[in-house]
Regions:
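Serine-hydrolase catalytic core
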Residues: 84-93, 116
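Conserved alpha/beta-hydrolase "acid-adjacent" motif
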Residues: 105-111
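Short, charge-rich amphipathic alpha-helical segments embedded
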Residues: 45-62
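Solenoid-repeat scaffolds in large eukaryotic assemblies
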Residues: 34-40
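Short beta-strand/loop motif that positions the catalytic acidic residue
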Residues: 92, 98-100
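Catalytic active-site module of serine/aspartate enzymes centered on a nucleophile-bearing elbow/loop
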Residues: 120-148
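Hydrophobic, aromatic-rich cap/lid helix
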Residues: 60-84
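Flexible "cap/lid" loop of the alpha/beta hydrolase fold
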Residues: 1-29
């Protein structure tokens, strides 16, 4: 069995991140602008409001975002065009649970549903009240139920 939490794809081709994002990340990292790279990801890729990111930069956890900012280019390369890879997904032959937060951005729930629909043995579950940073005490029971 397999479980996925909020697969980071898009259904709408117009919602995809900028095509030059790998170059943008690499330039920012080379220039020592790790925070800018993290901000670029949050605003240009995920679509978070700039005011959220401005506040995020003041939070204690922001240093962690900067520390891993160099990996954003790796992620962008792996993701390709960021559209749901339905042909690849359809080849997964194990029972798969696709989870998303019920309080998260709508595109995450839509994507989770689309992936579950494309899987031969897929099911989707939305965890009420949860955002992207899911509470482990909410996630664990859903996973336990599925894997038993």
């Amino acid at each position: 069995k397999l479980a996925l939490w909020e697969p980071p794809y898009f259904l709408d081709p117009d919602a995809r991140p900028p095509a030059d994002q790998v170059q943008q990340y690499e330039t920012m990292i080379a220039e020592g602008r790790r925070g800018d790279a993290a901000e670029y990801f949050m605003t240009k890729v995920v679509g978070m409001p700039p005011e959220f990111v401005a506040d995020a930069r003041t939070q204690p956890w922001w240093a962690g975002q900067e520390a891993i900012a160099h990996t954003l280019a790796y992620d962008a390369r792996i993701m390709g065009d960021y559209l749901v890879p339905t042909e690849t997904v359809a080849k997964v032959k194990v029972p798969t649970l696709v989870l998303a937060g019920g309080a998260d951005m709508p595109f995450m729930r839509d994507t989770a549903q689309a992936i579950a629909d494309a899987l031969p043995e897929g099911e989707v579950r939305f965890l009420d009240g949860q955002g992207h940073n899911v509470d482990a005490t909410v996630l664990a029971p859903a996973l336990k139920e599925f894997f038993e």
